[in-house]
């Protein structure tokens, strides 16, 4: 099933069909489909060559896909996991790139959640995950047709997002 976030990408690109997207994304397992879509943009903008993508996929670096699969063999690799990989392994590249200022503001916002202690501990990880997802989509999503809207954030984080007393059921 193609969710609304991926459907919006299909709607914007006349060369992609639902079948071709489904076939390609199903081969990316255990990478979440939206993380797989964003990876193209991430590694094109930050990597100097294919070595960074290769390192992410096949080395045992902290937060790499290989290490993630060893630690969590039945989980999906989500956007917040990709964020953690970038922070730990490509921080210097990010700092020297055109996204440095925006990335720093995302980092500071995430760090401030812990320092201010305004969010109960039981919700802190979910809030951090949502901010990482929003940040990743904000920085890299436009190039691939993703916006940090409610459906995309909910789909990309697997967090049960509630707005006040209302819950959309998505």
Q: Would you name each region that the model predicts?
A:
Residues 4-129, 136-152, 156-167:
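C-terminal helical "lid" subdomain and adjoining coupling/linker elements of P-loop NTPases
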Residues 170:
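Short, basic alpha-helical nucleic acid-contact segments in DNA-binding proteins
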């Amino acid at each position: 099933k193609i969710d609304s976030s991926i459907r919006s990408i299909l709607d914007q690109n006349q060369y992609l069909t639902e079948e071709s997207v489904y076939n390609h994304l199903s081969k990316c397992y255990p990478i979440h489909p939206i993380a797989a879509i964003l990876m193209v943009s991430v590694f094109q903008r930050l990597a100097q060559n294919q070595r960074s993508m290769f390192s992410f996929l096949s080395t045992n670096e902290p937060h790499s896909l290989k290490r993630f699969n060893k630690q969590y063999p039945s989980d999906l690799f989500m956007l917040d996991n990709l964020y953690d990989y970038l922070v730990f392994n490509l921080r210097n590249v990010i700092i020297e790139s055109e996204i440095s200022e925006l990335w720093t503001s995302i980092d500071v916002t995430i760090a401030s959640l812990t320092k201010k202690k305004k969010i109960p501990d039981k919700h802190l990880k979910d809030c951090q995950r949502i901010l990482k997802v929003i940040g990743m989509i904000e920085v890299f999503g436009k190039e691939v047709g993703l916006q940090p809207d409610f459906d995309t954030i909910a789909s990309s984080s697997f967090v049960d997002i509630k707005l006040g007393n209302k819950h959309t059921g998505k």
